[in-house]
Amino acid sequence: MATTAQQSPQPVAGKRKGKSQFLPAKRARRGDAGGPRQLEPGLQGILITCNMNERKCVEEAYSLLNEYGDDMYGPEKFIDKDQQPSGSEGEDDDAEAALKKEVGDIKASTEKRLRRFQSVESGANNVVFIRTLGIEPEKLVHHILQDMYKTKKKKTRVILRMLPISGTCKAFLEDMKKYAETFLEPWFKAPNKGTFQIVYKSRNNSHMNREEVIKELAGIVGSLNSENKVDLTNPEYTVVVEIIKAVCCLSVVKDYVLFRKYNLQEVVKSAKDSQPHPKLGNGKEAKLEPDSKLSQSDPPEGNQVAPESIEELGQTEPGSETQAGSEGDAKPEPESQVSEVPKTNENELS
């Protein structure tokens, strides 16, 4: 009798262990199909902020990106497993060559299964990161915003901002400096030049100093070409710095002011405004191309706040900047370089 009483709890204990073993697997579903499962150095993609509904945000992002991705790059093509590339049987004579061929076939088949857009864990609340493959995220996002600005059609509900990320690196000052020296060359290295501003946002990171990062990046831009100048009113280029935990996301975008900090909700509102937009002037319609630049003579969209001091470029600091903090609940986003547009959106989140 005593032995049977002692054995009865064992199946119950076994079931509990079985459940705990399967729980972590549910969190790993976002980065399937052989790709990375979380934001890490060496990725390209699109950083998207939302309003407390990440699952719905991912669904909207896939729908929107696939629609415009097919328009720009054509429909996505897939290859069945039976059609995976394979070498000739004659190469299998050597064991080492056969092993290399097998590894190459596995790698090639994995690349074929990777989707054009794949959601990965961003590491911050209300933030979604969509890894991209085989496309230029900055051109795709600009095309989306340009079309929404012209058509005045609202295509998303929970997506707020959509920022292209052209490169990622480790979020340490020395790593960022080394990476940025090469990353910024296509836009700012002579003979290329232009006016610029730097916007900075940090989430779940306490070891990076905003002032140091902006100062170092501005110095790199100035060293690439002395004719690169800071313009906080209407810059040709905006250097976007998004730090999440130990990963730094970088991009250089155009029409950042016109497209309301790349906020999809605000772009539609500004396009629906019956009055002439401040950037258009005298009621003239803005003519934007995929790689267009805003005219330097356009008036400012709002009262701009000056950034930290950039001694290399002759800028001054008013000392009134708001320190970027870690990610939390839904709050308006404090950009480091550009003040809020007079008509702000209460749903614009970090």
UniProtKB/Swiss-Prot annotation:
Instruction: Name its GO BP terms in alphabetical order.
Output: tRNA modification
Please name the SMART domains in this protein's record: THUMP (SM00981)
Spell out which residues are annotated as carrying N-acetylalanine: 2
**GO molecular-function annotation terms?**
RNA binding
Keywords, A to Z, come to: Acetylation, Phosphoprotein
Residue ranges annotated as compositionally biased, kind Polar residues, are: 1-10
| Phosphoserine sites (modified residues) | 8, 86, 88, 119, 270
Sorted alphabetically, which PROSITE patterns does this protein's record hold? THUMP
Please list where the region (Disordered) is annotated. 1-42, 75-96, 270-350
- What are the Basic and acidic residues biased-composition ranges? 270-292
Record Pfam families: THUMP
Query: What family does the Swiss-Prot or TrEMBL record give for this protein?
Result: Belongs to the THUMPD1 family.
Role this protein plays: Functions as a tRNA-binding adapter to mediate NAT10-dependent tRNA acetylation modifying cytidine to N4-acetylcytidine (ac4C).
Record note on quaternary structure: Interacts with NAT10. Binds tRNA.
Protein name in UniProt? THUMP domain-containing protein 1
Report the source organism. Mus musculus
Tell me the classification of the organism that encodes this protein: Eukaryota, Metazoa, Chordata, Craniata, Vertebrata
